[in-house]
């Protein structure tokens, strides 16, 4: 497996771990006789663990190197993923998912840091967008595969498959990942706290992080709410749900593909602005349809395709713009970006889940609000 393929795969490790078992959420809730909100904690707390762990893996990779840190993280992910299949109750499943997330956090932060190690910002944005195009296959295929595995062998088998993927990535990383951090092993020029203060005092860095976090928050409101909206409210089957989710992921793939083709011509900031404009318009359309009483698969998936298309512009360009100016602390810069993006999304999704009322309105309104706020935040990038 070439290095680029592995980096693309591990960037999507979190998405794989979430999207693959989304069709199983209602069954897991029924199996353990618990509520939808409690079951959704297996998603939202996974996301929180994924976010927090990046603050550990990123700075550690700045000091010790990318390769060793990635191998350690993938080992944790593989073992915890398999353990999820054998839990006796919902609390144990939530705990195992948190540990799985701690390992998964090594993937995206190390992959982005490696790209920064190897390329300057404009080229890095193109590389990340290209990785995103391929990575978008994860949310397309994962729910479909998860739905099939669930139908054939039950939800525990979904986690065994995740553990198997982790083992493949671990063995591959051991063979193909070089050490790209030229500063690995050198004494730190300044303490981590001071380097963190440098990042948080950089207005453009904060603006890029805010845009990425807000747009991803809208996407995650769909990720956590879509199974209950589409299966619970609209009555689609778990298998059909997988194809609906895949249609949205196709929007993300298309956005990434277009970003690869035109991103270097227009620049990071212009692509960011365009992506947030598309996201805001799509979110407002979904909310308007929900509030006038239109409740159909098309009224959800159509606008969400557009939102995901805009997200495909935003994520690679926000990451390249945020991490690019900090070559000596690319791991920390990538970690803070990932932490804010994922923690904000988890908190947003938890808040949205509390307003579940058996309609599409809470989810649609949350997606619209995220798009509008991201558009507003993108204006700060232009002013700093």
What label would you give each PLM region?
Residues 96-136:
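Cytoplasmic helix-loop-helix junction between adjacent transmembrane helices
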Residues 321-357, 366-367:
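A late C-terminal transmembrane helix in Major Facilitator Superfamily
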Residues 68-82, 163, 271-286:
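Structural signature of the two symmetry-related core transmembrane helices
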Residues 92, 121-122, 129-175:
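Helix-loop-helix hairpin linking two adjacent transmembrane segments in secondary transporters
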Residues 180-209:
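Juxtamembrane intracellular "pre-TM" segments in multi-pass secondary transporters
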Residues 31-33, 65, 86-92, 103, ...:
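Helix-breaking motifs and short loop linkers at transmembrane-helix boundaries and internal kinks
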Residues 52-91:
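Conserved MFS/SLC helix-loop-helix module at the cytosolic interface between two early adjacent transmembrane helices
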């Amino acid at each position: 497996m070439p290095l680029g393929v592995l980096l693309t795969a591990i960037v999507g490790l979190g998405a794989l771990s979430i999207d693959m078992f989304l069709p199983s959420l209602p069954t897991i809730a029924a199996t353990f006789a618990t509520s939808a909100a409690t079951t959704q904690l297996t998603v939202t707390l996974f996301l929180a663990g994924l976010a927090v762990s990046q603050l550990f893996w990123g700075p550690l990779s700045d000091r010790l190197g990318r390769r060793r840190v990635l191998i350690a993280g993938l080992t944790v992910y593989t073992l915890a993923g398999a353990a999820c299949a054998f839990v006796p109750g919902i609390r144990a499943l939530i705990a195992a998912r948190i540990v799985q997330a701690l390992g998964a956090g090594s993937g995206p932060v190390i992959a982005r840091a490696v790209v920064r190690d190897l390329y300057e910002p404009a080229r890095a944005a193109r590389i990340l967008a290209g990785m995103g195009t391929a990575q978008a296959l994860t949310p397309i295929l994962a729910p479909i595969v998860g739905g099939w595995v669930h139908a054939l062998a039950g939800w525990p088998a979904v986690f065994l498959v995740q553990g198997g993927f982790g083992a493949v990535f671990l063995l591959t990383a051991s063979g193909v990942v070089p050490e790209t951090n030229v500063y690995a092993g050198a004494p730190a020029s300044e303490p981590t706290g001071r380097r963190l203060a440098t990042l948080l005092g950089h207005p453009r860095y904060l603006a890029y992080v805010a845009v990425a976090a807000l747009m991803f928050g809208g996407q995650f409101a769909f990720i956590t709410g879509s199974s209950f909206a589409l299966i619970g409210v609209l009555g689609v089957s778990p298998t059909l749900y997988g194809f609906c989710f895949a249609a949205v992921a196709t929007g993300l793939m298309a956005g990434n593909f277009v970003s690869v083709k035109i991103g270097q011509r227009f620049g990071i900031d212009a692509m960011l602005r365009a992506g947030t404009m598309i996201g805001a318009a799509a979110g407002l359309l979904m909310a308007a349809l929900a509030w006038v009483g239109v409740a159909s698969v098309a009224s959800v998936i159509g606008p969400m395709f557009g939102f995901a298309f805009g997200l495909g512009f935003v994520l690679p360009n926000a990451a390249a713009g945020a991490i690019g100016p900090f070559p000596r602390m690319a791991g920390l810069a990538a970690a803070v970006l990932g932490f804010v993006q994922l923690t904000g999304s988890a908190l947003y999704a938890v808040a949205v889940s509390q307003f579940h009322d058996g309609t599409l309105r809470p989810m649609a309104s949350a997606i619209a609000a995220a798009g509008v706020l991201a558009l507003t935040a993108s204006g700060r990038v232009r002013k700093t």
